[in-house]
Amino acid sequence: MKIFGTDGVRGKAGVKLTPMFVMRLGIAAGLYFKKHSKTNKILIGKDTRKSGYMVENALVSALTSIGYNVIQIGPMPTPAIAFLTEDMRCDAGIMISASHNPFEDNGIKFFNSYGYKLKEEEEKAIEEIFHDEELLHSSYKVGESVGSAKRIDDVIGRYIVHLKHSFPKHLNLQSLRIVLDTANGAAYKVAPVVFSELGADVLVINDEPNGCNINEQCGALHPNQLSQEVKKYRADLGFAFDGDADRLVVVDNLGNIVHGDKLLGVLGVYQKSKNALSSQAIVATSMSNLALKEYLKSQDLELKHCAIGDKFVSECMQLNKANFGGEQSGHIIFSDYAKTGDGLVCALQVSALVLESKQVSSVALNPFELYPQSLINLNIQKKPPLESLKGYSALLKELDKLEIRHLIRYSGTENKLRILLEAKDEKLLESKMQELKEFFEGHLC
C-alpha cells in the first residue's frame, strides 16, 4: 500500500490518520532515520489544527519508544521546521500539517538532517519498514534506552532572526503599509513580528486560530478579503499565507491578486539584478504560463521545467545548480535562505523589490502579459488511469490540433482532478474547458 502522496502523508484525521496509523508511521520513519543518526534528536512542529495534538502525541510516543529524543516546538511554519532541523542539528524534522486543506484533514511531512524534503526512494524505504511487522515489533526500547521528549517554546526567535537576515540590510519597511492574512495558521505569531520589527505599518487579519478555522475562507486560497482590506486601508502590499505558510499570494496596492508566474518572473529578474542568482536557470513546474518562459528569455534567463510540487522544484534546482524557483500556486524557493517554499522569505523579497523599484506595487509586479489560462479543480469520486477513459485520447489529440496547451492530472492529496488549459484564443479556451469538465464529470463523478 502506498502511504506517501505528492507532499508527505495526508488524509482525514481520525479516518486515515488514526493514532495507530500515525504511531506505526512514526516508528517506521524513526527506524529509517536511525540508519544515519548523528544526534538522536528529531524535531516536531505543527500548524494550528485541533487534530495536531493527537498526531503529535502519537508521533512522540512512537519515536521515544524506539529510543529517539524528541523536541516539540508547537505551531510554526513548515519552512521553519526545515530551517530549525538543520540549525538545531537534528537527525530529522517532522511537520504536522495538511497545508491548504480544510481543518478536518491533517498530514505529516518529513525533512532530512539538512532540511530537505525526502526523495521518493526515501519515502519508499519508510513504506517498506511500515509493512515489516517483525521489524516494527522488535524495535521497542526498554529501561534507560527509551527516548525522552521536551517542549521548547523560544525557538521562534531563531527563525525570526533568520528571516530578517534574508532581507537586504540597507533597506527597511518604514515607508510601506502592509496587510497580512495569516489564515489562522502557523504564521499567526511569526509574520506580524517580522514585518513590524523591520518597520512596516502592519495590519493583520485572520490571526486568531481556534483549531477549526485554519484556511476557512481566508489565506492564500481565499485572498478576496485581503484584497478588500488592502484597498480599504490604502496599503502598499498585501500578503496571504496558507495554513503552514510555505505558500504566498500577493495583492498589489490596487487590490489585484498578482499571478504566481508574474511573481516568479519579476523576482527572478530582481535576483539577477542583484547578482544573486547562482546560475542563469530558473525552475518552474509544467503548469507555468508560456509567457513566463518568453519573458525570462528576453532577460537572458532560462526556464527549466519540473513536475508539480515544491519538492520536485527543489530537486530540479539542485540538479541545475539554481537557487531560485517555484510554482505559480505560490510555493517559491529562495534556496540561499530556505530549502523549501517559504512564504515569509518570499514576502520579504517582494517587499524589497517594490522598495528598490521605486514604483507602486501594481506597476513593479506586472512585468508582462500572460497568455489566457483556465484552471479548474474538479471534485471526483474515483481515480482510474486517465488513459483508460473512453474518448480521452481523442480529446487530447483535438486539443493538440487546436494548439491548446493542456495539463490534466489527479491531485496527490485530495479527491480532485486538476485541469489546466492555455491558449491564445480565450473564447476557444472557455469552450474547450466546459467540454472537458462535462467529459470528466460523466466518467469520474
Swiss-Prot record:
GO CC annotations on file: cytosol
Cofactor (UniProt): Mg(2+)
Residue list for modification Phosphoserine: 99
Record-listed Mg(2+) binding positions: 99, 242, 244, 246
UniProt-annotated catalytic positions: 99
PTM annotation: Activated by phosphorylation.
Enzyme class: isomerase
Cofactor binding annotation: Binds 1 Mg(2+) ion per subunit.
Biological-process GO terms, alphabetical: carbohydrate metabolic process; peptidoglycan biosynthetic process; UDP-N-acetylglucosamine biosynthetic process
GO molecular function list: magnesium ion binding; phosphoglucosamine mutase activity; phosphomannomutase activity
Keywords in alphabetical order: Isomerase, Magnesium, Metal-binding, Phosphoprotein
Source superkingdom: Bacteria
NCBIfam families linked to this entry: glmM
Protein known as: Phosphoglucosamine mutase
Organism expressing this protein natively: Helicobacter pylori (strain Shi470)
Lineage of the species this protein comes from: Bacteria, Pseudomonadati, Campylobacterota, Epsilonproteobacteria, Campylobacterales
